[in-house]
């Protein structure tokens, strides 16, 4: 069996009424099939909380987008259990436990910010 590395590229998105927040993630992470990787998402406005409703989206090389996690930790229907969302410290996190070669993709984090009038 040939072992290959998975390169997980990350981009960050920000949605909501506040245009001043900056969301940052690692630029790339690598693991081997069967490995565990934790991708994190940080906000410039402070700690990420459940009120930010962190969402994680996967983009495959053929530009197919799949919503993985919504509302910080809710796995979308049909998403394998190896994907999980959580908060770690002041960041949102996507954990891939037992990574598979088909997980080689871009991963996007989106946070919700609302402004009260």
From Swiss-Prot:
Listed InterPro entries: Ig-like_dom (IPR007110), Ig-like_dom_sf (IPR036179), Ig-like_fold (IPR013783), Ig_V-set (IPR013106), IgV_Light_Chain (IPR050150)
Pfam families associated with the record: V-set
GO CC annotation: immunoglobulin complex
Residue ranges of every copy of the Ig-like domain listed in the record: 20-117
GO biological process annotation, one example: adaptive immune response
PANTHER family assigned to the protein according to its UniProt record, in alphabetical order: IMMUNOGLOBULIN LIGHT CHAIN
Protein name in the entry: Immunoglobulin lambda variable 2
Source organism (scientific name): Mus musculus (Mouse)
Lineage: Eukaryota, Metazoa, Chordata, Craniata, Vertebrata
